[in-house]
């Protein structure tokens, strides 16, 4: 029987979602045919001539094998499948062929979940698997296992953005959450009802600008990381997170929780690479993972794993910018497990107070609403009606002139940094400043491309205000290690000053257990004390700070708390009846 092409299938071909030329029909393996006569259209298998008494078998509904896919290294082969569900909605899935070797049930589940009929019998499903293995479409496509930039194209499920596209590019990664690519309303509606409400509200402006950071990270040569809004539950943090999510799609799909394990980070990061990852309520992350999970997200690389046949699997990579909320900060959560974030963690995941200090939670301007609750309710209502339109417009315009955007981004970052980050700030503050500058540049670019309807300069001013608040909250422009060292010294003396130290001028000696040192009055005032610490006591302070003894000494000398010796190390003091102490 001749191959029959269903009108249903022709509709898919004439409206190719990839936007490129329609590929020729695939070469059909012997015995298989498309059939659209009667009530059971789809893929059928005719019985072999030697199988007397056998009937033709329906394997699946109508679908199209649009292209054969593989990654840039020539591995990860698969098929780009397209079909329409019973309601007429088009679906597309880049199926890895490796799934046919051991996870066929997942293949049938994915296709059935998208509304494609799949025969129930094991025999029929095995013949369908044979078809998918044997089918050789004429078109080829590059398949990627993460969203984002690939050879000049920005690849999202169902669409690749970029000019002069010579080859199809498709997403062939882990299945995405339902609704992730959904949209509702218009860009103009989103601008008027959501983006405009960020005027006068720096924290909302920060979150909306941050939603555009992902696609420009490569252009700015920026490392991964994120921002964390910390504060009370009723302050409006989650509403800001939902507003940011509305740039890309429905908040129900884009806003996730921190309730994940270190093993789940890789697929989540790959699904949100160079887009936006929204994570609500930090306290849902297990304290034992408080250090490793944020680090992995920012670091951009998966753990190396061994193949069963020997050698390492290809290491998954991503570039993620994430927004987070929670009542606790990362250091607070890590402390519950007796851990401390590694140096630089507070720059990879910048902690920002959610409370704006105006008595209105995160809000400062209510835009004619009577109170903060009414403003948040109106904004949440708007978020439910307007989403998923801003990111496609941004990507389309960004990809059309990627080189021009790169120049604008870098100039914006340099300008903002020069205006807001002091040259004598610590390296840690300067790194944080670059993170804030990146967010400001993203907001500025989105405005220039006509996606954010803000007045000129608002993104830069709003982000500058929050950077200044962040610097003040951390105690200045110094390194956080200095603050930890000083806190440890201050806490040690406050706790043990009377019990473990002996006064050198005391007329009456008393036993000192677990001695930490001595004290004496300073000259000429005599009202202040000078503390002489033993080497073991200094090591105890360093352990509390989580720093080397030399690093604590350096911080104490810089603060004027420790009198240095000739080599800028701690000064040695000789006491009668005691060995020399440092």
Where are the language model's segments positioned?
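A glycine-rich phosphate-binding loop feature that marks nucleotide/adenosyl-phosphate handling sites
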Residues: 228-235, 310-320
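Alpha-helix N-cap/helix-initiation motif
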Residues: 197-205, 230-233, 267-268, 283, ...
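Extended alpha-helical interface modules used as scaffolds for assembling large macromolecular complexes
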Residues: 3-78, 84-94, 98-166, 269-276, ...
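AAA+/P-loop NTPase substrate/partner-engagement loops
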Residues: 228, 238-290
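Solvent-exposed alpha-helices and their adjacent loops that cap or buttress functional pockets
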Residues: 221, 269-271, 314-316
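Short coil/turn connectors at secondary-structure junctions
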Residues: 223-225, 273-274, 318-319
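P-loop NTPase catalytic core of nucleic-acid-dependent motor ATPases
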Residues: 164-250, 436
